[in-house]
UniProtKB/Swiss-Prot annotation:
It comes from the Bacteria. This is Chorismate synthase. It is an enzyme of class 4 (lyase). Keywords: Amino-acid biosynthesis, Aromatic amino acid biosynthesis, FAD, Flavoprotein, FMN, Lyase, NADP. The lineage of its organism: Bacteria, Pseudomonadati, Acidobacteriota, Terriglobia, Bryobacterales. Reduced FMN (FMNH(2)). It comes from Solibacter usitatus (strain Ellin6076). This reaction introduces a second double bond into the aromatic ring system.
């Protein structure tokens, strides 16, 4: 089973990720991993932290001569901002006189209050340091490794932004547009339509002017998947459920949609289901549409997977909302921590990583293999079975 974990705080020395269960022989390019980290840092509306950090992955275990060796893989990403926090967040006790930059005025919408109560802290600093979306840097690095595995079998995962605030892309994006978007050297708001993107920018500008933040919707598309990843047999093996959990695990994501779920909920069944056809010349089944988003009964059906994440606006506001001081219990404006105005494009990149990780897990559950050669042999055998069905 492919597993991963992350560790590290927002202003700690580094972020760490480990992966276990990768077959030996997967080609790994640090340049590609770092490109994914760069993409996560881009986007109109990002805050000052992105001007400090230049995220680079260091693979310290599990890869030799640019290929996985079947051992646990470990990645470190160092925080440049750590140099400004060494005396504030030391590992060893710095004494009672140390400046800890305490956070005693929890921010509505963040983990501050619930976390402080749960872990019995009267300083929410220790909660927000781990709850911060800075943690997703490590997830994106893990996702880049998962993408490398999937790419060996012709599977690609891309994303784009379909809404910022009330401005929404009103047409479908082509695969070629998504590829071109992923190759951009300058990321604005991650929308494939220039006119729509310009209107999205106006929304972000308005939020900035008023000391506010803005959310939106991103879509992740996965192409090239075989029929049959996931299962209908148990509740927790259903692939759409696993993808939904992965997307909602992202900071600020409050909703998820697989396929055209919201549209389908307002329609009749005869207008929603994807009709089944058979191409006798090509000897395979085809579908009349893809409203299901590539998953039926918890299993891939061979079409593109479509998953959307809905982000609430970032919780940290330059014009703070009402809160209460944890120490005095008196009303007080919420604390302010350096933050972003809009993170929807970055969330799309993180969403790609989460989808790629879940798909890589499902792929290895289906095809197994201690080496890439063995995995490929199992995969090819299954494709032959599907072809001869």
């Amino acid at each position: 089973m492919l597993r991963f974990e992350t560790a590290g705080e927002s202003h700690g020395e580094c972020l760490v990720a480990t992966m276990n269960g990768l077959p030996a022989g997967i080609p790994i390019s640090l340049e590609t991993v770092n490109r994914e980290l760069w993409r996560r840092q881009q986007g109109y509306g990002r805050g000052g932290r992105m001007k400090i950090e230049t995220d680079k992955a260091e693979i310290v275990a599990g890869v030799r001569h640019s290929r996985t060796i079947g051992a646990p893989l470990a990645i470190i990403i160092r925080n440049k901002d750590w140099q400004n926090w060494t005396e504030i967040l030391p590992v060893e006790d710095a004494g009672s006189g140390a400046d800890r930059k305490p956070v005693t005025r929890p921010r509505p919408g963040h983990a501050d209050l619930a976390g402080a109560i749960k872990y019995n802290f009267h300083d929410a600093r220790y909660i927000l340091e781990r709850a911060s979306a800075r943690e997703t840097t490590a997830r994106v690095a893990v996702g880049a490794i998962a993408k490398a595995l999937l790419a060996e079998f012709g599977i690609q995962v891309l994303s784009h932004v379909i809404a910022v605030g009330s401005v929404r892309l009103e047409r479908a994006a082509s695969w070629d547009e998504l590829v071109a978007l992923s190759l951009r050297d300058q990321v604005l708001l991650g929308c494939v339509d220039a006119e729509t993107e310009a209107r999205m920018k106006e929304v972000v500008d308005e939020a900035y002017r008023t000391g506010d933040t803005v959310g939106g919707v991103f879509e992740v598309v996965a192409r090239g998947l075989p029929i049959g990843l996931g299962s209908h047999v148990t509740w927790d093996s259903r692939l759409d459920g696993r993808l939904a959990q992965a997307i909602v695990s992202m900071q600020a994501v409050k909703g998820v949609e697989v396929g055209f779920a919201a549209e389908g909920a307002a329609s009749f069944g005869s207008k929603v289901q994807d009709t089944i056809h058979y191409d006798r010349e090509a000897h395979h089944f085809t579908r009349g549409a893809n409203r299901a988003g590539g998953i039926e009964g918890g299993m891939t059906n061979g079409q593109d997977i479509l998953v959307r994440g809905m982000l609430k606006p970032i919780s940290t506001l330059r014009r703070p909302l009402e809160s209460v001081d944890l120490l005095t219990r008196e009303p007080s404006p919420a604390a302010y921590e350096r933050s972003d105005v809009c993170v929807v494009p970055a969330a799309g990149v993180i969403g790609e990583a989460m989808v790629a990780i879940v798909l890589a897990q499902a792929f290895l559950e289906k095809f197994g293999g201690d080496s890439l050669t063995e995995t490929r042999r199992n995969f090819d055998s299954y494709l032959e079975q599907v072809k001869n069905y």
